[in-house]
């Protein structure tokens, strides 16, 4: 039986809320929750609370929403809670050194990769785009660096040929709470075994941009197919046809050699719109024109066949 800990939880999106939910069902005591300030959302730009705030308030846990933890008065909010440990999951604010050192056991973070690979903001998307065969979560002791702290616990899962960032997100949102509860038990019992990260194995997962999601036909078909899965559901891979953006939801690689220039449509069938790439052919199977719902290539061909005449060069 592990000892009950007084925990401050800091997180913002749904991924974080799933970890808070596991903690609320555990033997530990959540003494306070820190989450980002309410943000405008939706067409009406109404201020909306984060998923973490909604969950915390439903369980009558005190919620704090500073825009920064640098001011002394905001750091005092942390100190006054007298926590044993602070658990940080996709919080979105930097924790100053003073805050990291306040709880008796410091601060720990749930990171969505197998560190030291993919430190940074977009580990799920980068691992998928790179063609990694597995990913996972790492629970680490936080320090002032970017995901540089000692590793306390890891759980891994395979990346399948069908995975998107959305499906991987769900897998890691299930794995993370398991790893977190195990780590907390080890820390409470004094059995945790911190492991220093090997700096020679470090890679960085830079934040995604919408411009980066524009399909670059000079890449190989295999790279582009992974990119499309990595950028689903955000920011979504896209191409430009007739001056308007068209999102690509699903594609597959055709193992044929073509001598057409990258970006050239080589065939348009009900199975897919086949486009030459830097290496191989990419078949676009599910697309979404601006202002429309996602549709099969067959449905899009029925309404916009003039877009996909073989020999046409896509931007």
Curated annotation (Swiss-Prot):
Cited CDD domains: FMT_core_Met-tRNA-FMT_N, Met_tRNA_FMT_C
Gene Ontology MF: a single term: methionyl-tRNA formyltransferase activity
Reactions that this protein is recorded to catalyse: L-methionyl-tRNA(fMet) + (6R)-10-formyltetrahydrofolate = N-formyl-L-methionyl-tRNA(fMet) + (6S)-5,6,7,8-tetrahydrofolate + H(+)
GO CC list: cytosol
E.C. code: 2.1.2.9
Broad enzyme group: transferase
Disulfide bonds: none
Binding site for (6S)-5,6,7,8-tetrahydrofolate: 113-116
Keywords: Protein biosynthesis, Transferase
Keyword field contains Mitochondrion: no
InterPro entries reported for this sequence: Fmt, Formyl_trans_C, Formyl_trans_C_sf, Formyl_transf_N, Formyl_transf_N_sf, Formyl_transferase-like_C_sf, GART_AS, Met-tRNA-FMT_C
Family: Belongs to the Fmt family.
NCBIfam families per UniProt: fmt (TIGR00460)
Function statement: Attaches a formyl group to the free amino group of methionyl-tRNA(fMet). The formyl group appears to play a dual role in the initiator identity of N-formylmethionyl-tRNA by promoting its recognition by IF2 and preventing the misappropriation of this tRNA by the elongation apparatus.
UniProt name for this protein: Methionyl-tRNA formyltransferase
Gene: fmt
């Amino acid at each position: 039986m592990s000892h009950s800990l007084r925990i401050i939880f800091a997180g913002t999106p749904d991924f974080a809320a799933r970890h808070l939910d596991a903690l609320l069902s555990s033997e530990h005591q959540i003494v306070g929750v820190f989450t980002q300030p309410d943000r405008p959302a939706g067409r009406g730009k109404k201020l909306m609370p984060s998923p973490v705030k909604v969950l915390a308030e439903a369980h009558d846990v005190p919620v704090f929403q500073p825009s920064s933890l640098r001011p002394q008065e905001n750091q005092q909010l942390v100190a006054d809670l007298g926590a044993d440990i602070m658990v940080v999951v996709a919080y979105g604010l930097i924790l100053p050194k003073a805050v990291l050192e306040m709880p008796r056991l410091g601060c720990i973070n749930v990171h969505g990769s197998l560190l030291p690979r993919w430190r940074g903001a977009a580990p799920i998307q980068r691992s998928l785009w790179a063609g990694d065969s597995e990913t996972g979560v790492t629970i680490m002791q936080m320090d002032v660096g970017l995901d540089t702290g000692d590793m306390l616990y890891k759980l891994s899962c395979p990346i399948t040929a069908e995975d998107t960032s959305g499906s991987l997100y769900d897998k890691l949102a299930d794995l993370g709470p398991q790893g977190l509860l195990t780590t907390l038990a080890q820390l409470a019992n004094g059995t945790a075994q911190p492991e220093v990260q090997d700096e020679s194995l470090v890679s960085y997962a830079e934040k995604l941009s919408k411009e980066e999601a524009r399909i670059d036909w000079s890449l190989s078909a295999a790279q582009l197919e992974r990119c499309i899965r990595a950028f689903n559901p955000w920011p979504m891979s896209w191409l430009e046809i007739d001056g308007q953006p068209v999102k690509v939801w699903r594609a597959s690689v055709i193992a044929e050699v073509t001598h057409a220039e990258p970006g050239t449509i080589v065939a348009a069938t009900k199975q897919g719109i086949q486009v030459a790439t830097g290496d191989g052919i990419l078949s676009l199977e599910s697309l979404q024109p601006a202002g429309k719902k996602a549709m099969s290539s067959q449905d899009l061909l029925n309404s916009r066949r003039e877009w996909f005449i073989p020999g046409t060069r896509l931007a």
